[in-house]
Swiss-Prot record:
Globally modulates RNA abundance by binding to RNase E (Rne) and regulating its endonucleolytic activity. Can modulate Rne action in a substrate-dependent manner by altering the composition of the degradosome. Modulates RNA-binding and helicase activities of the degradosome. It is found in: Cytoplasm. Keywords: Cytoplasm. This is Regulator of ribonuclease activity A. GO terms for cellular component: cytosol. It comes from Shigella dysenteriae serotype 1 (strain Sd197). Belongs to the RraA family. The gene is rraA. GO terms for biological process: negative regulation of RNA catabolic process. Pfam families: RraA-like. GO terms for molecular function: endoribonuclease inhibitor activity; enzyme binding. InterPro entries: RraA, RraA/RraA-like, RraA/RraA-like_sf, RraA_gpbac. The lineage of its organism: Bacteria, Pseudomonadati, Pseudomonadota, Gammaproteobacteria, Enterobacterales. SUPFAM superfamilies: RraA-like.
Length: 161
């Protein structure tokens, strides 16, 4: 499904929170949306593998990487796992790498930057916790919509039709 965050903001202005414009699109989908699962991890993506092995249909993984752009939390292997398990998208408050491969995949990926250095894989972090970045607080179960213009968040699903 295609999402237009500008149109959604016009219609649902009182019902959405707008994430500050810190992110760029690195995935093969120009827009994506779904119910979110939150993760907090710093320069370590081991926990992301466990979560992305789950069925992701209709879901978006929101990763609070502390805003670090020193190590990439998502690479092509991890993104392929997300595609295989039907995740709608990933929002990374941090960095990604292997961007040429990422843009070929049928998934939305919004991140702050790209860097060639990968993350540790120790599995350090926590999931289903409140995370805050970009001027917005994210809770697992909220609904996120993203496109090349921006990212918006709503407690309830928005009627797109």
């Amino acid at each position: 499904m295609k999402y237009d965050t500008s149109e959604l903001c016009d219609i649902y202005q009182e019902d959405v929170n707008v994430v500050e414009p810190l992110f760029s699109n690195f995935g093969g989908r120009a827009s994506f949306g779904g119910q979110i699962i939150t993760v907090k991890c710093f320069e370590d993506n081991g926990l992301l593998y466990d979560l992305l092995e789950q069925n992701g249909r209709g879901r978006v993984l929101v990763v609070d990487g502390g805003g670090s752009v020193r190590r990439a939390l998502v690479d092509a292997e991890l993104a392929r796992l997300a595609v295989q398990n039907e995740w709608e998208g990933l929002v990374i408050y941090g960095a990604v790498h292997q961007v040429d491969d990422l843009e070929e995949l049928d998934i939305g990926i919004q991140a702050m930057a790209a860097i060639p250095v990968g993350a540790a894989g120790e599995g350090i972090g926590e999931s289903d916790v409140r995370v805050n970045f970009g001027g917005v607080t994210f809770f697992s179960g909220d609904h996120l919509y993203a496109d090349n213009t921006g990212i918006i968040l709503s407690e309830d699903p928005l009627d797109i039709e």
